[in-house]
Amino acid sequence: PAQEAHQVAVAAFREAQVQYLNNQPWQTIKNTLTHNGYRYTNTQCPAADMKIGAQDIFPNAYQGKGVCSSDTTNTQHATNLWMSTLSVNENGKDKTLFCGIRHGVLSPYHVKDPILRQVGAENRAREVLTAALFSQPALLTKALQDEVVSLRLVSVGLLTTSTIVGNEDAMVQDQMRAWQSLTQPGNVIHLNIRNKEGELRTVKIKPEIAAFNTGVNELTLKLGLGHQASDNYNIGALHQLLGHDLRPEAPPGGWVGEWLAQHPDNHAVVNTLVRQIKDIWNSKLHHTDGNEPYKFAQRLAILAHEIGAVPAWNCKSGKDRTGMQDAEIKREVISLHQKATLTPLASLPDSDGQEIFQKVLLNSGNLEIQKQNTGGAGNKVLKNLPPEVLNLSYQRRIGDANIWQLVKGLSSLVTS
C-alpha cells in the first residue's frame, strides 16, 4: 500500500507539473545576433502564435497555451510544436535564410491502447502538416481559396531505433505509420484551418512526405544501436528525395531532380548538399560521430529548404536533440551566407565557425524552449561521460568550455 500511495503521489505531481507548464503563456521567442557586420534574427514561433487573424489556425485552438514535452498522453495536439526561422537584414529588408517545423515525437507513447495511440499520432501528424502549410504563405493562401495544393515535407526523426535500450523504436514505428496513413498515393487530405475572420475552413492538400530517422546520441554513434532499423526507413525516403541512383556521380532524380530542372541557374548549393548526403549514405558516415554528430540530419533539413520543401525534425521531447539540430542548421546557414560555401563533410568548425556556433547556441531561442518545457534552461545533449571515448564531439565543436557549460545549463537536473 505504501508503494502504491507513493506511485499515485508521483503521478499526481507529474500531472500537476504538466498542467502548469502547458498553461503558461507560450509566446514567440525572438533573438538577434551579429557576425561580421550582418544582423541575424532567430524566431521560434509556437503553435499558439501561428495565426492568420486574432486566433491560432488550429481547429482545436491552443488559446495562447502549449503542450510541453512531458505531456506524453496528449492525443489531440502535437508536442512542443514550433516554427523555427532564421532571417538576415539586408538593405533594410528581412530576408529568410531558413524556415522549418520542429516538434516532439508524433507518438503519444504513454497511451497504452494501441488504437487510441495511433489515432493520437495521426492527429499530431495533421497538426505538423498544418504548421508546415502555415510556413508556406503562398501555398496557404491558395489552399484557403479552395485550390488543392501539394505539400512536400522532409521529416527527420532524431531517435534511437533500438529495441535494447529505451522505447524509441516503438515511438518511431508509431510516427512512420502516422506519416504513411496521410500519404497514400494520390491521397487528398482535408485539414481544418482557422482563417483571418476566425472561421474554420476546410483546405485540401496532397501531402508527400520523405520520412527519415537518424540517431544522433551516444547509443547510436558510439555503441552502434539502431542503425539497421533507421536505415530501412531512410532508403525509401532517399529515393523520394534524390531518386533511385544513389551513386555520387549520378545526377539527382526525385524531388531534387525536379527542382533542378525548374531552377537550372541556382544549383551549386543543392548539388553540393546532394553529393555530401550521398557520401554520408554510401560510406555510412551517419553511423558514427566523425566530428559531426548531426551531419546527415542537418544536411537533409537544409536541402529540403533549398528545394522549396518544408523541413521538419523531431526527437522524443522536441527540445534537446531537436534543439541541437536547430542550432547546427543555423550555424551552417549563417556560415553559408557569410562564405557562400558549405562546410566540408566530417569537419570541426574553424575558429570563425565556432564563434558563429557559440552565438547561435546562446541566441537561437533553444534555451528558452527548454525552460518553457521543463522550468530549467539547458541542453541534455551536452554531457561528460566517465569513459571519455563515449563523449560526442561537442566540446571540440563549440570550442569554449564556459559556453559549453552555459548551454548544458540545468539539463542534468530536470526530468523529461
Swiss-Prot record:
Subcellular location: Secreted
Domain of life: Bacteria
Record keywords: Hydrolase, Secreted, Virulence
InterPro entries in alphabetical order: IpgD/SopB
Gene Ontology, cellular component aspect: extracellular region
Residue numbers annotated as active site: C315
Family matches, as Pfam families: IpgD (PF05925)
Assigned EC number: 3.1.3.-
GO molecular function: phosphatase activity
Top class in the EC scheme: hydrolase
Sequence motif CX5R motif, location on chain: 315-321
Domain description: Contains the consensus sequence Cys-X(5)-Arg characteristic of Mg-independent phosphatases.
Protein role: Converts phosphatidylinositol 3,4,5-trisphosphate (PtdIns 3,4,5-P3) to PtdIns 3-P and prevents the transition of PtdIns 3-P to PtdIns 3,5-P2. It is one of the known effectors injected by Salmonella into the host cell and is required for invasion and for an efficient generation and maintenance of Salmonella-containing vacuole (SVC). Alteration of the phosphoinositide composition of the plasma membrane causes membrane ruffling and actin cytoskeleton rearrangements.
Family listed: Belongs to the phosphatase IpgD/SopB family.
Protein name: Inositol phosphate phosphatase SopB
Gene source species: Salmonella bongori
